[in-house]
Amino acid sequence: NNLPQNNKNLNVIKGDVRDLNKLKISLKNHDAVIHLACISNDPSFELNPKLGQEINFDCFEPLVLLSKDLGIKQFIYASSSSVYGVKETAEVTEEASLEPLTDYSKFKAQCESILLSNTNNNFLGTIIRPATVCGYSPRQRLDLVVNILTNLAYHKKIIKVFGGSQLRPNIHISDMVRSYLCVLNADDQKIKNQIFNVGFENYSVEKLALMVQKNIKDKVELQYSKSDDNRSYHINSEKISRLLDFTPQKNINEAIKDLINVFDKKLLSNTLSNQEYFNIKKMQSINLT
C-alpha cells in the first residue's frame, strides 16, 4: 500500500469493510471514524454494480451502528458533490435538493441519510461533499479530470475534451486532506449533523483543458467530442469557510504544475497504461469485474 510504513502513530490493519467482526476488533478504543471506503467513482462502480452496492451501501449502516455502539464520538462520511446531479443554479449550496443521476451517487445520498438519522449528542455525524480531487499524491490516480487532461497533454500532446461545457468543481488533494483534519478538530457544535461542500474552483471541462494546455511547454492539440456524462454543477463552499474558518491553500493550476513536475522527474512510470493509476484497470486486473 501507499501508507507511511514508519509512523509509530499509524497502525495499518488489512481488512474488508464488509467484515463486521474485524471492524469490531479494529474500532475499539477509538474516538473517530473517517469513512473513505468505497468503489469510486461512477465508471468503476458500473464495472460491478453488485460489488459496488455491497461496498458503498450495504455495509454502511452496520458500520455506523457498530461505531455508535462502541462509543465512537465522531463519524465523518466522505460523500460526493455528484449527489446534486445537474443543477442550473448559479451556486449550489448544501441545502440544494439531491438529484443523483447514477447508482454511485444515489447510494452516496442514501448513506448520508442513514448517518444523520443515527446521530445524537454522543455520536456526532458530519458529511463532506468533496469536489473532484486533483494533483499529485502517493496513491496517484490519473483517472480524474484534471489529472487525465494533464497526463494526456504531457505525454501525447493531445487533450480529448468530452463535451466541454459541463461544470466540474475540483480541489487539490492536499486541501482535501486538510478539510478532514479541520472537521476532525472542530468544536462539536459546529460539526454536529452538518454537511459541508468542499470545492472552491468550479470550471468547465473546456476551461480545465485550456488551463492544462497553457502549462505545457510543447504545442498541445484539443480534440472535442460528445459526452454521455451530463453531470454539471457549481458548488458553493462558503459554509465550511464561515463555520470552520477553512480556506484552500492550493489551486487547480498548482495541481497541474505539480503533476508536470512529477512527470519531468519521471517519478511515475508508464502513466498512460499502468493499472495502478486507473481504478477501472486495477479492478479488471484483480478480477473484480
Predicted regions span which residues?
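Conserved Rossmann-fold NAD(P)-dependent oxidoreductase catalytic core, especially the SDR/UDP-sugar
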Residues: 35, 61-103
